């Protein structure tokens, strides 16, 4: 069994050694331009077209929760990956836990009005504020996949009213489910906090725009943990300036790194982080990949395969 590995920033040698230890029967190598030798599996992140083109692979593993970097290249270079080759993403591998930590900490930050008190501190002003009440602090999760379900579970511990929206209806205990475009407005109408965990597909690009934001209650909050392309940044800034949106926590952006001239850096109602809400944990990723390869070799059914047509 031959495995090729490519990631522009990861510690390649660590990964190769870890994979060799986890899959002793495999010959694992770092892919370099010009390497056309045979391979059974490819582990990749933002791979060059030539790495995958023409290969008879058993499977490709994207080294993250999203596969948009591969699917976008496939649109321009359909020869990059044969339609018969299964494409897998890392469904969790510790990312769910990280998303839970990030989402819960920020929701509580807003719920306890720490954002308002920070503004008071900056102006040396002392004024206790009325508390928010849980029953009026509904949290909506936009995108109800694996990570969305993890976030919902963690927020249930804090007894917030929860709702989710996705392409198809979900049956999560204690979570009100909305499905399809026809139910999006009803979903948004009660969301004091909107958490975006949508996949990046042509249908979801720009979905968080002026029209969507206007359907939220006045003074709502936005937490974007998915992709920057989901948000029309000018529309969000306008909603923040008008007070329609009271605050935003953004981990992802249309351009990354976020350009120094972006007004998001200095906006008093925006907090940003550099795409770190959930990063790939190497040891857990290696365990998932080795387990999945073993299942594939036995012809067993496995989880995490991407539907290329849907984009996730």
Curated annotation (Swiss-Prot):
PROSITE patterns: D_2_HYDROXYACID_DH_3. GO terms for cellular component: cytosol. GO terms for molecular function: glyoxylate reductase (NADPH) activity; hydroxypyruvate reductase (NADH) activity; hydroxypyruvate reductase (NADPH) activity; NAD binding. It catalyses: glycolate + NADP(+) = glyoxylate + NADPH + H(+); (R)-glycerate + NAD(+) = 3-hydroxypyruvate + NADH + H(+); (R)-glycerate + NADP(+) = 3-hydroxypyruvate + NADPH + H(+). The active site is at residues 227, 275. InterPro entries: D-isomer_DH_CS, D-isomer_DH_NAD-bd, GhrA_Enterobacterales, NAD(P)-bd_dom_sf. Its main location: cytoplasm. Its EC number is 1.1.1.79, 1.1.1.81. It is found in: Cytoplasm. Keywords: Cytoplasm, NAD, NADP, Oxidoreductase. The keyword Transcription does not apply. Pfam families: 2-Hacid_dh_C (PF02826). NCBIfam families: PRK15469.1 (NF012013). Catalyzes the NADPH-dependent reduction of glyoxylate and hydroxypyruvate into glycolate and glycerate, respectively. PANTHER family: 2-HACID_DH_C DOMAIN-CONTAINING PROTEIN, D-ISOMER SPECIFIC 2-HYDROXYACID DEHYDROGENASE NAD-BINDING DOMAIN-CONTAINING PROTEIN. Belongs to the D-isomer specific 2-hydroxyacid dehydrogenase family. GhrA subfamily. This is Glyoxylate/hydroxypyruvate reductase A. It comes from Escherichia coli (strain ATCC 8739 / DSM 1576 / NBRC 3972 / NCIMB 8545 / WDCM 00012 / Crooks).
């Amino acid at each position: 069994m031959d495995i090729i590995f490519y990631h522009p920033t990861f510690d390649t040698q660590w990964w190769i050694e870890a994979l060799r230890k986890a899959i002793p029967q495999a010959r694992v190598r770092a892919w370099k331009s010009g390497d056309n030798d045979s391979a059974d599996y490819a582990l990749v992140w933002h791979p060059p077209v030539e790495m995958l083109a023409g290969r008879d692979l058993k499977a490709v593993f994207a080294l993250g929760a999203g596969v948009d970097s591969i699917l976008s290249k496939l649109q321009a270079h359909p020869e990059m990956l044969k339609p018969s080759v299964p494409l897998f993403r890392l469904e969790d591998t510790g990312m769910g836990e990280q998303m839970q930590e990030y989402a819960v900490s920020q929701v509580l930050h807003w719920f306890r009005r720490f954002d308002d008190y920070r503004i008071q501190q900056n102006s040396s002003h002392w004024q206790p504020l009325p508390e928010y009440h849980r029953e009026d602090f509904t949290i909506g999760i936009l995108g109800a996949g694996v990570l969305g379900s993890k976030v919902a579970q963690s927020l249930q511990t804090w007894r917030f009213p929860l709702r989710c929206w996705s392409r198809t209806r979900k049956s999560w205990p204690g979570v009100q489910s909305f499905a399809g475009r026809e139910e999006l407005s009803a979903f948004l109408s009660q969301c004091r906090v909107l958490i975006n965990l949508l996949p990046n597909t042509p249908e979801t690009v720009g979905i968080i725009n002026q029209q969507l934001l206007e359907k939220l209650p006045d003074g709502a909050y936005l937490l974007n943990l998915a992709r920057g392309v989901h948000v029309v940044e000018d529309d969000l800034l306008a909603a923040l300036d008008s007070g329609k949106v009271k605050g935003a926590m953004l981990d992802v952006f249309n351009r990354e790194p976020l350009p120094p001239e972006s007004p998001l850096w200095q906006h008093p109602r925006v907090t940003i982080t550099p795409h770190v809400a959930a990063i790939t944990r190497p040891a857990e990723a290696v365990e998932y990949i080795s387990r999945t390869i073993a299942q594939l070799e036995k012809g067993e059914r496995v989880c995490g395969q991407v539907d290329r047509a849907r984009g996730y």
